[in-house]
Amino acid sequence: SKVRSIDFFTASAVTLLPFENFALSSNQQKNQLPNQSVTSQKDQQPLRIGFISATSVGGMDLSERFYESFKKNPKQGRLREVISHDCGASTELIASYLGINDFITTISTACSSAANAIMLGARLIKHGQLDAVIVGGTDALCRFTLNGFNSLMILDKIHCRPFDRSRTGLNLGEGAGYLVLQSESSLQRAPYCELSGYANTNEAYHQTGSSPEGDGAFLSMSEAIVSSGISPEDIDYINVHGTGTPGNDASEGMALRRIFGEHVPPFSSVKAFIGHTLGASEGIEAVYSVLSIDKGLIYPNLNFTDAMPETGLIPETSFQEGIPIRHVLSS
């Protein structure tokens, strides 16, 4: 189907809120999310601050912009200059704007990009390399990306329906989401919560598809729970990946059944609100997870009507407030 032209936008200023899978806890221990940024340690030594940003399709707009000149003259068109996409340009610009230079890197691992950024930041703090790290991701859309996903035949022409029997695909979105991870020794204010565990895996089933048994999701979620030092029964809410594609939701649902059996905690996908924001998705959904603990929120899984026959799982369909939530698993 034809995709209409999209206007590009430039953000002149950003507000930073203070993976494969990670678990968040209300306890205060090692890697923490502060209420505001901290510029110095208690002993007045400068903080070692890093910036780890994720993207999945960063730089693809260059190919789109250069294509017209290439089409007019293939021998001189600027598309010949594009050897590779510089997906780290936004990372360097944001770090420069914020004055961060201790550690800067970009991660691009498709839709797990921001989750891996969060995990790397936590590890750098754990091993004493940094005191604080801004972690998350950002992605913006262009026709190149939209048509690429359209060629995969996984776009839904109407609102996506995560975990619904009638789901046929995803809706793309764009945006950014970041957290500030900080070591306990450098904290000057009470944190929102603790990043208590994390894990990623590679099931090597297929280049773009998940195993029907949910092996990858099962392993990463299980290991994240073990890493956090809690048991599956301690999870109060799950922010699932829930793209709305037939393959992902069936695979992820099988993983949930394997871990929790008949006692799957309340879960939902926020992608029906924000779309699949690609490399930014796990950063944005980490913010949702933090707010879930801080404010006692459970988000509704929009557009759900009928359970998938593969698992019979029913997500939360109403917005809930004031719920005592100690541990959130984000997939």
Task: Report the location of each language-model feature.
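Active-site-proximal alpha-helical scaffold in enzymes
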Residues: 14, 18-19, 87, 95-98, ...
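Condensing-enzyme catalytic core mediating Claisen C-C bond formation in acyl metabolism
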Residues: 159-228, 237, 324-326
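Conserved active-site "lid/cap" helical segment
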Residues: 1-31, 35-53, 59-60, 220-232, ...
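Glycine/charged-rich beta-loop-alpha catalytic/anionic-binding loops adjacent to active sites
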Residues: 70-80, 96-107, 156-164, 201-202, ...
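Acyl-CoA/ACP chain-elongation machinery
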Residues: 129-151, 156-167, 198-212, 240-249, ...
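Active-site nucleophile and cofactor-binding loops and adjacent substrate-binding regions
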Residues: 3-7, 81-88, 105-113, 169-171, ...
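Active-site-proximal gating segment of KS-fold condensing enzymes and close homologs
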Residues: 55-105, 248-262
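Flexible, low-complexity linker/loop segments at domain and module junctions
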Residues: 43-46, 234, 312-331
